[in-house]
C-alpha cells in the first residue's frame, strides 16, 4: 500500500504547486451541484459536481483508486482495500501526511501538519489535517479531510483537500460525494 501512496505523491504535488498559483489569483469555481454526474463502476457509486472531473481510475482486487479534480486545485481521492488487510484511518492518514510532507516541491515546501479526530458523519470516521503549502515565499493554508468506513467487503478511504479559503466553494461537492457514496445496486 505504501507504493500506491508514493505513486499518488507526484500527482498531488503537481496539483499543490498549481494550487498555490491558483489560490493567489482565486481561480476556484464553486462546486456545481445542478445535475450532478454519477460514477457507477467497480461495485461503488456516488454523485459528484458536474464541473469536476475524474482524472484517474484504477482498480485491482487489492486496490481501487479514483483521483478527481475540481475546476480549481482542490482534489478528491477515493481508495479502497479489502477490509481484512486495510489499515486503520489513523495509520492511513499519518502515512499519507508523512509521505506528502517528505516529498520535495520545486521552489517550495509543505509545512508539518496537525492531525485531529473529527466527529463521525454519514457513517464515516474522520480525521482533519491542516498544513501550509509555501512556494516562492507565498504560504497558502490548506485543509485535508480523511474519511473512512466499510462498504461491502471493502474499507473505503476518502481524502478531500483544498485551500482553506476555497472551502466554501468545495465543501458542498465534498459533501455530495460523501453523502451519496454507496455500494452499487446489484453488486
Where do the protein language model's features map onto the residues?
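A short acidic-to-branched-hydrophobic micro-motif
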Residues: 64-95, 142
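Signature of long, low-cysteine stretches enriched in small and polar/charged residues
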Residues: 98-150
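N-terminal targeting sequences that direct proteins away from the cytosol to non-cytosolic compartments
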Residues: 2-9, 16-71, 81, 111-121, ...
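Glycine-rich phosphate/pyrophosphate-binding loop shared by adenosine-nucleotide-utilizing enzymes
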Residues: 156
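Generic solvent-exposed, charged/amphipathic alpha-helical segments
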Residues: 93-101, 178
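Residues in well-ordered beta-strands of folded domains
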Residues: 79, 130, 159
